[in-house]
């Protein structure tokens, strides 16, 4: 991968999960990218805190085969690493993760996993960067209970 790629550090608890910083409503927020999740979601408490509206309801199938009804979904714009804006439709959920991006998000990118890093690249589209020193700050914040 070249230096125009986003680099995400693997979660200490799950090899399929990676962390990145994004900006929503002019606030820097930690985002979890899960290569094992089929759909992306955002917590209802995050929407309420940041005054983001939601709409529509849908049922989704979970990794274990069960179905979960998500009452709403919302369209938000995330600025990844200060360079690229990505518009995403996220389902609203009561899960503890504030923002989780799944394979529905990853389908928009060429991605590669090497060691403990996930590299995202939009090929012909504008690219964005994340400096490795910021990754370690994210991990430290995420390992502190209620740190985010």
From Swiss-Prot:
Alphabetized SUPFAM superfamilies for the sequence: Acid proteases
Any one Pfam family match given in the protein's UniProt record, by short name: gag-asp_proteas
UniProt GO MF annotations: aspartic-type endopeptidase activity
GO process annotations (BP): proteolysis
The protein, known as: Uncharacterized protein 7
Organism, scientific name: Soybean chlorotic mottle virus
Lineage: Viruses, Riboviria, Pararnavirae, Artverviricota, Revtraviricetes
